[in-house]
Amino acid sequence: MSAGRSAGVGADDRGAALVTSLVLVAVLVVAALLGGVVADLLAARQRAAAAADLGALAGAPAAQTSEANACAAATWVVRENGATLRTCAVVDGDVRLTASARPRAPWSRWLSELLGGAVEPTAAAHAGLR
């Protein structure tokens, strides 16, 4: 038997560290991408919530005159805050609305469409002058 390597356990382990390293790097890259997607979805949820809150507040004074005026004011404010108004109604003098916001990162949109449809976090808000 030579002095270099023994013929026992682990004799065929040459290159195992490279394969293990490549798998580890791949797992870390996927984890980082998923973390970015989650962060982007959370940011979109916050954007939708802020837009809904501000839209309801903007529509509340106009709700005293008509539902159309209230929803027009809410639509403008929601759009200016980077979201889309989904529903708007005046109920008992309160403006009630929902808004949604799309993720901004392209990989988030791509992944959400790959998983069965565009994911748009939605938020609801209401405001009135009472």
Which role does the model predict for each range below?
Residues 2, 56-105:
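Short amphipathic secondary-structure patches
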